[in-house]
């Protein structure tokens, strides 16, 4: 699905008029075009399904890395910074830090690809809970591992700048699949690494 930049421009122009401003005045002349270009960039992830993202970043290694010697060995990354936009208010979700873990099953994914997946999934109209679920689903497809965990901490503009207006409020969500959900030893190890 392609983003319709021209339609966005027209609608932003209409919003400016609805707000009581003049889209022809000096400061706003190019605003509809700039906003449309920005939306094309920040919502790039909406152009791709989870299957397409999995295909795009499916760069794995199947070396003999002794990854099968201990079935609870895990790959863990944290502090992956992303942003997204709340689908309810189009408000920015910011200061988002993603932690991702998986237990390899015969193949591993390049580390930069994990960060790219998180970034691409964030570039959609989203819920924080769904970001975690989407990342987990994509990693499961690429690695063939059921054992995936995603922890996300972030701030939501819809909570911090409007409505209740509570700046600094952080939301933490977890998506735990496979052993991360069923094996206390694995989940404890995850939490130890996350809080370290």
From Swiss-Prot:
Gene Ontology BP annotations: one-carbon metabolic process; tetrahydrobiopterin biosynthetic process; tetrahydrofolate biosynthetic process
Involved pathway(s): Cofactor biosynthesis; 7,8-dihydroneopterin triphosphate biosynthesis; 7,8-dihydroneopterin triphosphate from GTP: step 1/1
Domain of life: Bacteria
GO MF annotations in UniProt: GTP binding; GTP cyclohydrolase I activity; zinc ion binding
Catalytic activity: GTP + H2O = 7,8-dihydroneopterin 3'-triphosphate + formate + H(+)
Broadest EC class assigned to this enzyme: hydrolase
E.C. number(s) listed in UniProt: 3.5.4.16
UniProtKB keywords: GTP-binding, Hydrolase, Metal-binding, Nucleotide-binding, One-carbon metabolism, Zinc
Residues at which Zn(2+) binds: 86, 89, 158
One GO cellular component term noted in the UniProt record for this chain: cytoplasm
Subunit structure: Toroid-shaped homodecamer, composed of two pentamers of five dimers.
Family per similarity comment: Belongs to the GTP cyclohydrolase I family.
Name this polypeptide is given: GTP cyclohydrolase 1
Gene: folE
């Amino acid at each position: 699905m392609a983003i319709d930049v021209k339609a966005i421009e027209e609608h932003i122009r209409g919003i400016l008029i609805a707000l009581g401003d003049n889209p022809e005045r000096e400061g706003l002349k190019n605003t509809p075009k700039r906003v449309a270009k920005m939306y094309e960039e920040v919502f790039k992830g909406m152009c791709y399904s989870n299957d397409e993202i999995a295909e795009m970043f499916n760069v794995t290694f199947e070396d003999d890395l002794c990854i099968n010697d201990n079935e609870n060995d895990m790959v863990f990354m944290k502090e992956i910074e992303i942003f997204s936009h709340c689908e309810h208010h189009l408000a920015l979700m910011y200061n988002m830090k993603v932690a991702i873990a998986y237990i390899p099953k015969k193949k591993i994914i390049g580390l930069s690809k994990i960060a790219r997946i998180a970034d691409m999934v964030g570039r959609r109209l989203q819920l924080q809970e769904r970001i975690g679920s989407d990342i987990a689903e994509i990693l499961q497809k690429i690695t063939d591992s059921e054992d995936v965990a995603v922890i996300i901490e972030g701030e939501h503009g819809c909570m911090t700048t409007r409505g209740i207006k509570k700046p600094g409020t952080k939301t933490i969500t977890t998506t735990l699949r496979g052993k991360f959900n069923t094996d206390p030893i694995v989940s404890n190890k995850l939490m130890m690494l996350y809080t370290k």
